[in-house]
Design a protein with these regions (language model features):
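FAD-binding core/adjacent interface of flavoenzyme oxidoreductases
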Residues: 1-4, 72-140, 220, 246-255
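Beta1-alpha1 glycine-rich phosphate/pyrophosphate-binding loop at the start
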Residues: 2-59, 141-142, 150-173
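Short, well-ordered coil/turn residues at beta-beta hairpins
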Residues: 8, 100, 106-108, 113-115, ...
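Glycine-rich nucleotide phosphate-binding loop and flanking beta-alpha elements
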Residues: 13, 80, 111, 152, ...
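Internal hydrophobic alpha-helix adjacent to the cofactor/substrate pocket in enzyme cavities
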Residues: 17, 21-25, 165-172, 279-301
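A Rossmann-like FAD-binding core segment of flavoenzymes
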Residues: 59-92, 97-100, 162-247, 297-301
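FAD-site-proximal beta/loop scaffold in flavoenzymes
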Residues: 121-137, 223-280, 287, 294
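Active-site glycine-rich loop that binds ribose-phosphate moieties when present
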Residues: 125-133, 144-157, 176-177
């Protein structure tokens, strides 16, 4: 039986495994091979890794974990978690089972995009959601924002000082006159209708509407809906927040003893939502690991 099993090998899971390994706690890191930033070419706003390809970041982290005898890494998908603190059993997709005293969920969220032809193919390449991660790369260039008015206005406020111009498109239909006036007051050009399709050629992204085409350097989508990528919160009956995230305390502990959650799948109730950022995921992974280490030590394990 492992001290801790970490499910998910993005930044949060990798850091949790590293912290456990450094404290000589037996840990199993299970990597499904699915990552929220799996289509992203370069990650940004991460000290010492600004511009690093996420795949390189993960590869380096896994190579470093190999130096710790107490950490095992497997490419495996978990189907189900049963049990309680001190005796959790995980069923794997290959039919095997593994057991642990504690669990860290670091499975990440999945993005559900507006149903616009071509958008999914451009996600992380020509279409983005995070201005902190990808805004600077569009400095001095024209961009488009897609989304309902309130969220679009927030993005316009963040990106307006960075880019040369912003054209805002409704996700569907058209903006109400009051919303149009608000968006125009922020300096945006307001399109009359939603995009029918999106395509990219070279460095240019073209949005096609019923009225014609608009060409920009990139798109920021304000209407992304995020959901839990894995079913474990429901399986375990974890307390959830209105944002769709798992409720945690300062050390990532959930409502079920022995189960912690780290990364963008969880946040404290005092926050409106989880910020999807590599640096924050790393910090959350370390906190979750430390919480379990302290708990195990208190038990004399």
């Amino acid at each position: 039986m492992y001290d801790v099993i970490v499910i998910g090998a993005g930044p949060a899971g990798l850091q949790a495994a590293l912290t456990l390994g450094r404290m000589h706690r037996s840990a199993l890191l299970l990597d499904s091979g699915e990552y929220r930033n799996g289509t992203v070419l370069h990650m940004h706003n991460v000290a010492a890794n600004d511009g690093t390809p996420p795949a390189d970041f993960r590869a380096i982290a896994r190579a470093q974990l190999a130096e710790y005898a107490d950490v095992e890494v497997r490419d495996a998908r978990v189907e189900r978690i049963d049990g309680e603190q001190g005796a959790f059993t995980l069923e794997l997709a290959d039919g095997g089972t593994v057991a642990a005293r504690r669990i860290v969920l670091a499975t990440g969220m999945a993005d559900e995009l507006p149903a616009i032809s071509g958008l999914q193919e451009l996600w992380g390449v020509g279409a983005f959601s995070c201005p902190f991660c990808d805004g600077h790369e569009h400095a001095g260039k024209p961009i488009a924002v897609i989304g309902e008015a309130a969220r679009a206005a927030h993005l316009i406020g963040l990106l307006g000082r960075i880019v040369s111009s912003i054209t805002v498109f409704p996700t569907e239909g058209s903006f109400a006159e009051e919303d149009r006036a608000t968006l125009e007051a922020l300096g945006a050009v307001v399109a009359s209708s939603s995009p029918l399709s999106i395509a990219r050629e070279g460095e240019t992204v073209t949005l096609t509407t019923a009225e014609g085409e608009a060409s920009v350097a990139g798109i920021f989508v304000a209407s992304v809906v995020s959901r839990q990528r894995a079913p474990f919160a429901e399986q375990l009956g974890l307390a959830m927040l209105p944002s769709g995230a798992i409720e945690i305390d300062d050390f990532g502990r959930t409502s079920v003893a022995g189960v912690s959650a780290a990364g963008d799948i969880a946040h404290r109730a005092s926050l409106p939502g989880a910020m999807a950022a590599v640096a924050l995921a790393v910090a959350a992974g370390q906190l979750a690991a430390v919480g379990h280490i302290q708990s195990l030590m208190a038990e004399g394990a």
